[in-house]
């Protein structure tokens, strides 16, 4: 029984209904157009069979003959298949992807997530030329409806800012497989939800704060100039959009819920208060004690419209340190550094005991050289300094130091 080509291919490519549910449909090979590459009854050698691909002759008794071919015909026949394959490859449309600089790439490869997307479009005549936009997340969401069943959509979390305290974030949505549309909708919504963040010295936050959203907990700490951004990769993009340059943020709990992470961090930024606002609310001076000034107090802000409190009117809550004043009494988990395996071995303990008498020698050396008491840390210089100090003590110029094992010289009473 003769069968057609489509019927023969169906025996190789067909899958039952139960097999389609189990994923066997993707394992079947597609239909190959064999007629483009090979014609049944022909071969590269041009073999002729009487009655099949050649006419039958009365006086010809040979059933098979090989036709003579020129070199050009042989070359064209051998290169025909190669030419068809090349035409098939060149017919496909290839996506021309622009090669990005390594510093301009996103969080993963060539994806848009984490890349700079430019300024938002103008809204009601307001331009955002100095703004920069980042896409923090693109994901597929689903919603079960009673009419259409499970409806899938694309969701994009976008943040935009000018790097000087103005920023905004929003979630844009679009139909399934419309990632670009979701990002564009998110950019337009973020440009309509602009908020302002107060920055200390234009680079960091005013005080350490704690914020949470769902199962995401954020501990933000201010840092000195030049520290940089040490935080979650998504928070780095948010800080760049806002203009924060020096900060340390510890994230506990869920670190993959980027919307909750963004909301918690922005909430903590908006709830902080400046030094002047703190001075007005508490009626006290805000004082900074920096090691660069040997911890001498320097007044940063003073109350203007509020009466200044005195020592008698101070309460116990007013005597808190600035680090303990904020944060709702919560502190980030700081695990102690794990001890090495040899910390309690006998040999290591003996070595520490032998080094114990010299434990302060390095700090003493630095102090003596810094105070210009010893010009160089050599034996001759130290001996000369010790001899000079001994002479001053013997002559009474300097008092004799009193410490452990030393006491006042008390004359013995005469009986």
Swiss-Prot record:
A Gene Ontology biological process term: translation
Endpoints of the signal sequence: none
Domain S5 DRBM: from-to ranges: 131-197
Domain of life: Eukaryota
Location relative to the cell: Mitochondrion
Main subcellular location: mitochondrion
Presence of the UniProt keyword Mitochondrion in the record: yes
Family: Belongs to the universal ribosomal protein uS5 family.
PANTHER family according to UniProt: MITOCHONDRIAL RIBOSOMAL PROTEIN S5
Protein name as catalogued: Small ribosomal subunit protein uS5m
Organism: Caenorhabditis briggsae
Gene name as annotated: mrps-5
């Amino acid at each position: 029984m003769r069968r057609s080509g489509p019927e023969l291919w169906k025996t190789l490519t067909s899958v039952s209904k139960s097999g389609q549910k189990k994923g066997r449909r993707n394992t079947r090979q597609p239909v190959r157009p064999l007629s483009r590459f090979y014609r049944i009854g022909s071969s590269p050698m041009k073999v002729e069979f009487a009655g099949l691909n050649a006419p039958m002759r009365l006086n010809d008794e040979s059933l098979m003959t090989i036709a003579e071919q020129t070199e050009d015909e042989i070359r064209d026949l051998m290169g025909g298949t190669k030419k068809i394959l090349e035409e098939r490859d060149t017919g496909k449309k290839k996506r021309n992807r622009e090669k990005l600089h390594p510093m301009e790439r996103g969080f993963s490869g060539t994806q848009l997530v984490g890349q700079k997307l430019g300024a938002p479009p103008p809204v009601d005549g307001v331009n955002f030329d100095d703004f920069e936009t980042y896409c923090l997340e693109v994901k597929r969401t689903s919603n079960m409806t009673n009419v259409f069943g499970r409806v899938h959509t694309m969701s994009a979390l976008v943040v935009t800012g000018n790097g000087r305290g103005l920023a905004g974030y929003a979630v844009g949505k679009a139909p399934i497989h419309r990632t670009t549309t979701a990002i564009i909708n998110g950019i337009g919504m973020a440009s309509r939800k602009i908020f302002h963040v107060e920055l200390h010295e234009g680079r960091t936050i005013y005080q350490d704060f704690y914020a949470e959203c769902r199962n995401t907990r954020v501990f933000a700490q201010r840092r000195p100039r030049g520290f940089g951004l040490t935080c979650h990769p998504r928070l780095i993009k948010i800080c760049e959009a806002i203009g924060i340059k020096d900060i340390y943020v510890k994230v506990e709990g869920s670190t993959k819920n980027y919307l909750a992470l963004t909301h918690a961090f922005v909430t903590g930024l908006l709830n902080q208060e400046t030094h002047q606002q703190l001075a007005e609310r508490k009626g006290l001076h805000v004082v900074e004690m920096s090691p660069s000034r040997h911890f001498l107090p320097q007044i940063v802000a003073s109350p203007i419209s509020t009466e200044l409190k005195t020592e008698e009117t101070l309460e116990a809550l007013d005597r808190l340190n600035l680090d303990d004043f904020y944060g709702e009494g919560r502190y980030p988990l700081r695990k102690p550094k794990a001890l090495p395996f040899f910390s309690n071995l006998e040999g290591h303990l003996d070595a520490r005991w032998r080094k114990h008498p010299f434990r302060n020698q390095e700090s003493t050396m630095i102090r003596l050289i810094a105070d210009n008491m010893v010009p160089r840390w050599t034996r001759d210089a130290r001996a000369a300094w010790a001899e000079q100090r001994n002479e001053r003590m013997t002559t009474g110029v300097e008092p004799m130091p009193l410490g452990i094992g030393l006491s006042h010289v008390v004359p013995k009473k005469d009986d």
